[in-house]
Amino acid sequence: MEPNSLQWVGSPCGLHGPYIFYKAFQFHLEGKPRILSLGDFFFVRCTPKDPICIAELQLLWEERTSRQLLSSSKLYFLPEDTPQGRNSDHGEDEVIAVSEKVIVKLEDLVKWVHSDFSKWRCGLQAGSVKTESLGRNGQKEALLKYRQSTLNSGLNFKDVLKEKADLDCLGEDEEETNVIVLSYPQYCRYRSMLKRIQDKPSSILTDQFALALGGIAVVSKNPQILYCRDTFDHPTLIENESICDEFAPNLKGRPRKKKPCPQRRDSFSGGKDPNNNSDGKSVAKVKCEARSALNKPKNNHNNCKKVSNEEKPKVAIGEECRADEQAFLVALYKYMKERKTPIERIPYLGFKQINLWTMFQAAQKLGGYETITARRQWKHIYDELGGNPGSTSAATCTRRHYERLILPYERFIKGEEDKPLPPIKPRKQENNSQENENKTKVSGAKRIKHEISKSKKEKENAPKPQDASEVSSEQEKEQETVNQKSITEPLPIADTKKKLEGYQDFAARPLVSQADPEKDSETDQGANSEKVAEEAGEKGPAPPLASAPLAPTPGTGKQSLTSPSALVDSKEPKPCCFTESPENELQEASFPGFSTTQPPLANQSEVEDDKLPAMADYIANCTVKVDQLGSDDIHNALKQTPKVLVVQSFDMFKDKDLTGPMNENHGLNYTPLLYSRGNPGIMSPLAKKKLLSQVSGASLSSSYPYGSPPPLISKKKVIAREDRCSSLSQAHHGQSTDHMAVNRPSVIQHVQSFRSKPSEERKISDIFKHDKLSRSEPRFSFSKHHLSPSKKSRGRRTVEKRALPHSHMPSFLADFYSSPHLHSLYRHTEHHLHNEQTSKYPCRDMYRETENSSFPSHKHQEKLHVNYLASLHLQDKKSAAVEAPTDDQPTDLSLPKNPHKPTGKALGLAHSAPGPQESKGTSQFQVINSQSRDCHPKACRVSPMTMSAPKKYPEALSRSGKPHPVRLENFRKMDSMVHPILHRKMSPQNIGAARPIKRSLEDLDLVIAGKKARAVSPLDPAKEVSGKEKASEQESEGSKAAHSGHSGGTSEGHKLPLSSPIFPGLYSGSLCSSGLNSRLPAGYSHSLQYLKNQAVLSPLMQPLAFHSLVMQRGIFTSPTNSQQLYRHLAAATPVGSSYGDLLHNSIYPLAAINPQAAFPSSQLSSVHPSTKL
């Protein structure tokens, strides 16, 4: 036949390397065209002398390099044609296959076919299906399709079948001598099927069920069915000249085991690949010893060439390459060290340590990083390195290792140093996954964008140390990062580091002592807080809170809940940082009205307070954010890097100037507290709206969502902080602390007061006394500060914080009503409400009034609060004297009277008894209260009697300028309000309260409008208060003592009497409706009850008064803070139920926490941690 008679039929069915695979080919047999396709059986005679055998065509391909048309076939011989011959075990229809396939050129295969096969008489003569009947019902196509699908691996043979059909139309019967070889199981099934249908027409074999059961429909005229179940080694087949196994295709996939690079390259090198691989192939395909012997020499020859080629490079590698490798490594390590990214350890890839020289050489051979990446050839580099072939991420891991270890040097060599390097975050994350996880855990506040960016910076700054560093080193890095951030911010690095160290020490001690289970987390939190503190510098106290509020469990939440003392300790160092940080200066600049003399102490105490309750800081932070939106002071503090409210608070902590963030921390901490439990750093749209409305309402100096919170700095805490931070903060203390306390007393002081609570808890009674003394001083400074709305806010916060130590809950009330004017307003409100609603919920109304009056007097409130706190400090000694004046004031029946007398003791007890829990909770409350003071709606009407924690409350009374009796009455009213927690309605401040509620927003708007604007507009009221504060400072002092006694009494008399006044605003109307009234137990009466029903005042339940600030600040929003708050309340009040008990007892049921019946529930819901209590 002519060579050109051979041609492929159909389209190619596959490509692999140099091979193109086909399904069929056509040739001419005796002048007749015939098509052989994959899977076809046909008779062949290998040589004229050889017996007839059956060939099964298994593979057809063309080698592009040599243009050879090749086939691979399996040969079947009759048993008698094998060396062993036929025996009794062989069946009549059995054939035996040659163990090795034969590779034959198509032209030779065609020659094999040209023979006379008429002598073949073996095989089962199967009845053929008549093509006429098949043609009529279309079964022939179906039959052929079935055969091709089952016998040809599902390849599409339509085109081949079409060609065959065309040949049939020409009358060419190429299947005249059709033969089929089955496996033994197939043959058995076929015979079984024939037996079952023996009496039926053969066409039934085309039935799909018959085919499925093993029937075979043969359309050829003389089909012969045979089966094969054994193989043999043909002795002389390998000697056939037509068989050319050297052309066997190399169809191996990727090597499952590492092969020498040269062999692998040769295997992919094209034309000679089959020969090179014929060694393996021959063993696999030909078991004949002769065949193997023939193939081995070829392979050995090829291998010899390879070896000879490889031996020289190996020798060179042994000598030259070693020198080159050493020089390369020296240069690489030197360069990487110079660029501040030293190669500390060489990573492992595929369970094998990377050879940097091999990796570099392989990359250069493939064209370098850019080329390899573009061509996606990193897997080749991985293979060169000899890694585990089973890795599914080999390419990515190899590329990242190269980017981190070698790419900078490659760019340096090529003079492309200016070319930006690809981001190596994934690489860093892989190396520092554990450390990064720890960091994430430690700084939960990193969720906030700002903090996230800082964490990224930290990671970038400390990725290398992280690789080898332990958790401690991670914390150190965090601290370093914080320091760096602090440096970025005004806070000095040294001071930041010192603060961080002190903070770590304090945080570690209290955490360890207070909550072993949370010890680790707290330590991490402490480190995180330190880190944040360093980052935020002045923000120091707030950043830990910020991070904690964002991730309350990892950081602030745990500290505040687990160990108030730890918080105090950790936060105390932060106050130092705060004092030192330029943020204080910013705050001072922001709030120039604040006097610098008092603020340092206030800042220290604030810092301590901030340290004590992380949630408080968180709340303060939140407040700051709100303030920064709403108040110029806060905005000044935050203006460096203001962001979204809640997010901003945390971001502010980290990214804002240290001074600004410190001041902001109190306010910001409030806002984060709002969202800290449930959504650390994440606010629902409704909450955001409310918070924004609060912020807009708090645009004024006292425009904190809760009104500018009265200073939460307790002098005791301030003093403690001064002692702790004096060394660090002395440089910045005069400026930063004063500025901080003065600039943003409400926010920072609130936060600081919370933070300082843990330490206060440790020495509550002593601190309470000390606080009173300290507060007296801060009160005056703050009063000066309060002269300006910003100063008042800061002073108030500072005072609140100072008052906090005395009675966490009472001091919180004092915070809420720290300013004398607010306090008096609160007292009036309390009195009127008591008179009006004594039977029902006088406290609630009082709270509303207080809120209303509180906002107008917010600025004064800060001032008053400071004075009041100072008074509380003084009144710890003069509690009895102050109690009388308070009694003179119209008393709200809902408020307990006895708290006035125990002010000093009760407050001390409240601080000491609550221990970490109460101090934390109180701190948080105080923070909230101070914020509420900023927009104190609750205490607005009771202007003289701003109800904050007992200490703060007396201060507020003193500052209110009202007689101590009025303050005491207000405090009592607050106490009673604590029981009847129904003052949500007074929630113009509630808007600023824990959670921005629609009603809160409305109230805030009203406050802004001037209806409840007194409490709602902290700035303007703060201004008013500033004037009032001066007059009311004296009163504050007197009423401070009275209120301290009152709060203390409340604490002793009720589980949460002091707290109650603090929380009513938080929970019920006061919580949402009146920031000032939150001290009152108005909505608190029954923790669950009043939380659920603001209208229900249950004396059974110790009034857990959450200041609206507290609620707005999110104290209850974060489960940790709320629990801590509750615990603080329980500890503070002799009623003896812990926060957990209170929470469990429904003092702060979820519904109670969100007492929106009396006031817009949205406010509480956004803040309350009800779902997490």
Curated annotation (Swiss-Prot):
Residues 450-462, 1021-1040 have a biased composition (Basic and acidic residues). The modification Phosphoserine is found at S267, S1017, S1118. It is found in: Nucleus. Keywords: Activator, DNA-binding, Isopeptide bond, Methylation, Nucleus, Phosphoprotein, Transcription, Transcription regulation, Ubl conjugation. One of its GO terms (biological process) is positive regulation of DNA-binding transcription factor activity. The modification N6,N6-dimethyllysine is found at K340. Residues 249-283, 416-607, 777-802, 877-924, 936-965, 1017-1055 are annotated as: Disordered. The keyword DNA-binding applies. Methylation at Lys-340 prevents DNA-binding. Demethylation by PHF2 promotes recruitment of the PHF2-ARID5B complex to promoters. Residues 322-414 form the ARID domain. The gene is ARID5B. Its main location: nucleus. Residues 593-605 have a biased composition (Polar residues). There is a cross-link at residues 130, 449, 497, 499, 763, 769, 878, 901, 905, 920, 973, 985, 998, 1040, 1055 (Glycyl lysine isopeptide (Lys-Gly) (interchain with G-Cter in SUMO2)). Residues 253-262, 782-796 have a biased composition (Basic residues). GO terms for cellular component: nucleus. InterPro entries: ARID/SWI1_ChromRemod, ARID5B_ARID/BRIGHT_DNA-bd, ARID_dom, ARID_dom_sf. This is AT-rich interactive domain-containing protein 5B. Transcription coactivator that binds to the 5'-AATA[CT]-3' core sequence and plays a key role in adipogenesis and liver development. Acts by forming a complex with phosphorylated PHF2, which mediates demethylation at Lys-340, leading to target the PHF2-ARID5B complex to target promoters, where PHF2 mediates demethylation of dimethylated 'Lys-9' of histone H3 (H3K9me2), followed by transcription activation of target genes. The PHF2-ARID5B complex acts as a coactivator of HNF4A in liver.
